[in-house]
Every structure is written in C-alpha cells, then in structure tokens.
C-alpha cells in the first residue's frame, strides 16, 4: 500500500511539474505574439506618435491644427476608431493644436496632461478644455514618478515634470516605454538643463530616442545622449521650417551615439515594431545622399543584394542596412563587412556606422 502511495505521489509530482513547464512556455509563446508598434507620424513641424498594443491605441501629441489632415489620414489608414489615451506632452500648438479635432473624429476615452501647467492659455488649450468638458472625457494629470498604462503588462514611467515652470517646454512630460527588452524614450520639448537633471535621477538607457524639441540646439546635451545611448534616434520635424530644426551640430552629435538617425521631414512616418526582443523599423521614404527620394521602400534592409552594408557608388560612402540615408537601388553596392567596403575605397557614414 505504501509502495502504491509513493508511486502515486511520484506520478502526481511529475504531472504538476509538466503542467507548470507547459504553462510557462505557453505564456512565453503568447507574449512573443503580442507585438507593439510605435509610429512617429509625419505631421510637418510638430509631433504626433501612435502606440498600438493589444488592440489599444495611445496617441502622444497631435501636431498643429493646420497639419491635422496628415494625422487623420494616418490614423484612418491604421483603422483607428477609438483612442484609449491621448497624452498631451505640453501646451505648444505644434504638439496639441489638433487635440480637439481628434476628440471630434475619434472616441477618446482619456486625456493625460502634465500636472504642472503654465498660467498662460492659448486658443488651442481653450478648445481642448471645451472638447474634454463637452464630451465628458476622463482626465489624468501626471508628474515625475507617475505611471501611464498602455495595456495589460505594458506601461510608461514618467520622469518629468518634477516641478512647475512658466515655460511650456519645461513642463513637457518625459516618458519611458518598456516592452520586454525594448524601450522608447519620449522627451517632448525639454531643454538641456532638464535633460541633465534627468541623468542624475534615472536610468535613461533606451533603444529608441525621440530627440527633444525637434532637434533644437537648446536640447540634446552630450551627457544626456551618452546616458540614453539609443541605437535609433528619431527627429520629428518639418521640411524647411523657419526655426532651422534640426540644428546641424545636433545631428552630428547624435551620430556619435546612435547607429541610425531618422527624420520625419526626410523619411516620412517612422514605425517601429517590437516583439519584446527584436525591433524592426519601416519608413515611408528613404532619403538618399544624392538628393533623391525613394517612395514606399518598406522595411529598410540589404536583402536585395545580400550584403549587410550598402555603399553609394557616387559618394563612395557605405551605410548600415537600416540607415535612413540609403542611396536608390541603381546607385547601391553591397558589402558583407565594413572592412570589405573600405577595401574598395568606401568610407563609413558617420551617422550609422562611422562611430
């Protein structure tokens, strides 16, 4: 009897362990199927970013009211009907000018804003306040230390603002989104002083950085960029804007820390897809060294020629396969290594492989 009981207990133990292991691997497998996308939308001189995960749509900023048609066209192309959370990083019109129009056209369930607001109100703020009130939308105010939920298992940590300022840019919400082993840092329009203050408080290391203030010369401090150490940098900026964004020296500085630099004025909308382990990037266009623009290239890769590095036969510069400045196909030469490219007299592109 004792022998039978011992055997029965052994079988039960094996069964429990087997079920636990199978459940564990099933959970991992299901997690890998849950892809997250982050799209930095081309809205001209402004900023708008769409996060999609588990059927939820989270919109960070909306761009200018005058550029709203670009945002709406993109949202409709993604079959967006409702927005679970519209986050307004700060009150500049190039970040929230279209917010009331988003509420008009889509079912917005929540609006998140910074806890600290400057006293001065512009026309867009008044329109947004009215739209929130008229549609009885829930609101949330966040500051450093707050959390913003995207969906089950994924949230954003808020790093700023930590105190009130009379300057809108300094009140920008700074957030870090984590999805498995991948991370994104959103910076609004913060300046170098706030960037350096964040360095003292947080681990900023991220895979993707939305460059602060459209690449303004008042942001992107060296120390900050070195701590973020982003493989990908994205500049939300409008072509021919009157502010000179992005500053040339900022772009060069980014090249010291990022492998790939994307600009919405040249690359159009930039979309990252994360499975929790890997990141894929897709752009609307590829901006080329020779001034040509290749439309709808799909995912940027070197598959056509089988090489990891892509050279421009006209400039004798070679790029990484995901660079945002690849030449058009007829001007490409493929290489298996940087050394291979250099043996043919090519030099590395400073913003992607020439680090």
Where are these regions (language model features)?
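SH3-family beta-barrel domains
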Residues: 299-316
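Accessible peptide chain termini
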Residues: 1, 307-308, 320
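A short, charged, amphipathic alpha-helix used as a generic interaction element across diverse proteins
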Residues: 336-348
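Non-globular, low-confidence helical/coil segments that flank catalytic cores
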Residues: 2-304, 325, 331, 343, ...
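Short aromatic-glycine-(Arg/Gly/Cys) micro-motifs in beta-strand/loop hairpins
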Residues: 312-328
